[in-house]
């Protein structure tokens, strides 16, 4: 059996944890499996490298930043190979150039385009554990690129798809996917399994276990994922195609504090102005989530929308630079907000879900600023200091602690 395993930075943050992961790998080798391991940079290595760069230059180029921070993953895979070799097992570390993994040119947020599996397959045939750097690739000019948030998860799924692996295991510091963040909800329940679509919505609404890009790729190539803890030996959560077509239940509630609300005030109420505004943001690769347009008055309207806090300053800059072109009066930005979402199959056939969610928020004295809905998700924007009360109340209202 060919298994792709991915370990995050916290799982390899210390020498003891590196040896713990090495022992887990050895267990699978002893069982006769071929193993490919994707590793993130250890602990806070990436943050430290970014800080060092900004000491030298507050506005470093994205190309050089990718060159710098990619060294964190190279340290991880080399140290793991050294550890396994010291324990008597064959292992080889490969970076993105050696695999190779090809991406587009978008430094700091590249997309994987193709993976050559010949080198990895040859190393597996030689009996090696293959350790691959996560989070990075190379573009057509042989420059190093990084994949942005969730890049190591995405690397693991892409390798599993390319190698036609039998299993793809994502190891984290929690035991699986829960109905809510256990830090907020003490009786949050671990899910045995969840469908791609629901996991994708949870990932994109604040659940930190898997990144949405990783889930998108898993769904596209039908790669079944197993989310496990690297610290505790226990069954995890399987993420796969949902076969329960008529299932109507809430899978979980998630909160995302990496949100900012931007409002563009006094836009002329005429065709094309919203297109112009969002087209400007699109050209800067700024993703927009919840959108609210006010009722027009005196020939103008206000448009509010949410972006990640990472993109908020860039979004405000772009809009302020184009205020006259848009015909708008002002731009405001609020970062003291958060998005709380419930996710579950069959919401459109169960109209009571929205009412129950809003009742839970009312009971917790939580004010709603914006609302967004889809077939399997309802999201609200609230004050960030009310997140815990909101999540706890919603989890209790839907009795998510009970196994359905």
PLM region spans:
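Acidic-aromatic/histidine active-site loop/patch
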Residues: 218
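Short phosphate-binding/catalytic loops that engage adenosine nucleotides
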Residues: 33, 89, 223, 286, ...
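Nucleotide/pyrophosphate-binding catalytic subdomain
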Residues: 1-215, 382-383, 402
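Membrane-embedded hairpin module used as a gating/binding unit in multi-pass transport
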Residues: 214, 224, 241-243
């Amino acid at each position: 059996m060919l298994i792709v395993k991915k370990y995050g930075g916290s799982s390899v943050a210390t020498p003891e944890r590196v040896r713990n992961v090495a022992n887990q790998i050895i267990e699978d080798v002893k069982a006769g499996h071929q193993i490919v391991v994707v590793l993130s940079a250890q602990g806070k290595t990436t943050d430290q490298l970014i800080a060092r760069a900004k000491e030298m230059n507050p506005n470093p180029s994205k190309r050089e930043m990718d060159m710098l921070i990619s060294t964190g993953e190279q340290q991880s895979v080399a140290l793991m190979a050294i550890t396994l070799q010291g324990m008597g097992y064959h292992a080889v570390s490969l970076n993105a150039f050696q695999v190779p993994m090809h991406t587009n040119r978008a430094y700091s947020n590249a997309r994987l385009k193709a993976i050559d599996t010949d080198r990895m397959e040859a190393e597996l045939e030689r009996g090696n554990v293959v350790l691959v750097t996560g989070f990075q690739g190379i573009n057509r000019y042989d420059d190093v690129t990084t994949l942005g948030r969730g890049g190591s998860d995405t690397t693991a799924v892409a390798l599993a798809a390319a190698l036609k692996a039998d299993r793809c295991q994502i190891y984290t510091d929690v035991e699986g996917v829960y109905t809510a963040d256990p830090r907020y909800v003490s009786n949050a329940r671990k899910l045995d399994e969840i469908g791609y679509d629901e996991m994708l919505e949870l990932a994109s609404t604040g659940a930190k276990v898997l990144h949405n890009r990783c889930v998108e790729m898993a769904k596209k190539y039908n790669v079944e994922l197993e989310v496990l803890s690297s610290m505790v030996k226990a069954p995890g959560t399987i993420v796969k195609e949902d076969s329960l077509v008529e299932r109507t239940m809430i899978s979980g509630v998630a909160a995302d504090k990496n949100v900012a609300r931007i409002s563009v005030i006094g836009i002329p109420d005429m065709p094309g102005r919203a297109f112009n505004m969002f087209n400007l943001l699109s050209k800067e690769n700024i993703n927009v989530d919840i959108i609210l347009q006010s009722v027009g008055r005196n020939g103008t309207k206000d448009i509010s929308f949410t972006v990640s806090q990472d993109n908020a300053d860039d979004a405000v800059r772009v809009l302020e630079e184009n205020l006259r072109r848009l015909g708008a009066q002002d731009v405001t930005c609020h970062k003291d907000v958060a998005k709380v979402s419930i996710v579950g199959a069959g919401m459109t056939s169960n109209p009571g879900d929205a009412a129950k969610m809003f009742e839970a928020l009312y009971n917790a004295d939580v004010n709603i600023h914006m609302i967004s809905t889809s077939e399997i998700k309802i999201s609200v924007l609230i004050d960030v200091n009310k997140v815990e009360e909101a999540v706890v109340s919603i989890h209790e209202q839907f009795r998510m602690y009970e196994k359905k």
